[in-house]
Regions:
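A short SAM/SAH-binding and catalytic strip from SAM-dependent methyltransferases
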Residues: 123-137
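Short alpha-helix
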Residues: 194-217
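Conserved class I S-adenosyl-L-methionine
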Residues: 152-184
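A short glycine-rich, Lys/Arg-flanked "PGG" loop and its adjoining helix->strand segment in the class I
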Residues: 137-152
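Class I SAM-dependent methyltransferase SAM/SAH-binding core
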Residues: 57-113
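A short acidic, Gly/Pro-enriched loop at the edge of an enzyme's catalytic core
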Residues: 112-123
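Conserved alpha-helix/loop element of class I SAM-dependent methyltransferases that forms part
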Residues: 28-57
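N-terminal, positively charged/glycine-rich alpha-helical extensions of SAM-dependent methyltransferases
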Residues: 1-29
Length: 258
């Protein structure tokens, strides 16, 4: 395994616990899903069209967790590689690979330092993986390195507004709870894990400076039949119907970093 940061070590501890509490038990359900859906409330990709045709594409999933996204893409003809820093989640992913007969490489590494050759992939994806659990000043340039010219970066994260309204304790507020100025690295009270959330302007500048052009930014709202999540309860359906709690970014590699 490549060298990892102290924050990555903390997040590995946090996700080892989360895997024991929830993601190991939920993995079979997500692997079995026929439809691609995104985020806590399961917004169908068919209603968004953010991903495009993945058949024949080489895909790297950065912060893959139990690798259900890679499994979804493999069923659609992609050639995925999953990368994650948490051995427990990769063990769950391997068990699901054996059960469902879907095989692809799984690599234990931080998305900030991936032991794979440059320009090896057509698509890099992250649904609540590297997109919030890795330092974007490291993982986004690393995604750029891994992508071929014209390759796309796709990632889903919490919306900036949701982060600004998130209370340190209790349900989300309908008023701002923190300053946007200086928003970036976040340590929530009582949590071992470390999150990252750059405001939109800083994220735009980072992507452009790295050598990406922004293709799309989609704010997500729950489907009509959505219910509150049984485990990820930071934002309720009621709150998220009024304001987007999640967002998808799509960017294309056009040149080298500046």
């Amino acid at each position: 395994m490549t060298e990892i940061s102290d924050d990555a070590k903390r997040n590995r501890v946090g996700w080892t616990k989360a895997n024991a509490d929830f993601t190991d038990k939920s993995a079979r359900h997500t692997w079995a899903a026929e439809e691609i859906t995104w985020g806590v409330f399961g917004v169908p990709e068919a209603s968004l069209h953010t991903l495009g045709d993945v058949a024949g594409r080489d895909v790297v999933e950065l912060g893959c967790g139990t690798a259900y996204v890679s499994a979804w893409l493999a069923r659609r003809g992609a050639h995925p590689v999953g990368v994650d820093v948490t051995p427990a989640q990769l063990a769950t992913a391997r068990r699901c690979q054996n059960e469902f007969g879907i095989d692809f490489p799984l690599i234990e590494a931080s998305a900030e330092n991936v032991p794979l050759p440059s320009e090896s992939f057509d698509l890099a994806v992250s649904e609540y993986g590297a997109s919030i659990w890795c330092d974007p000043h490291f993982w986004i340039p690393e995604a750029h390195r891994l992508l071929r010219p014209g390759g796309r970066l796709w990632f889903l994260r919490n919306s900036t507004l949701a982060t600004l309204c998130a209370a340190d304790e209790g349900p989300p507020a309908e008023t701002l709870q923190r300053s946007q100025r200086g928003l970036g690295r976040i340590e929530w009270p009582g949590e071992v894990s470390v999150e990252w959330q750059l405001p939109h302007g800083e994220m735009f500048r980072l992507l452009r400076r790295t050598g990406f052009v922004i293709v799309d930014l989609v704010e997500l709202y729950p489907p009509d039949d959505a219910v509150d999540h049984c485990y990820y309860d930071t934002f309720s359906v009621e709150w998220s119907r009024k304001w987007p709690s999640e967002e998808i970014w799509v960017a294309e590699k056009t040149r080298g970093p500046q």
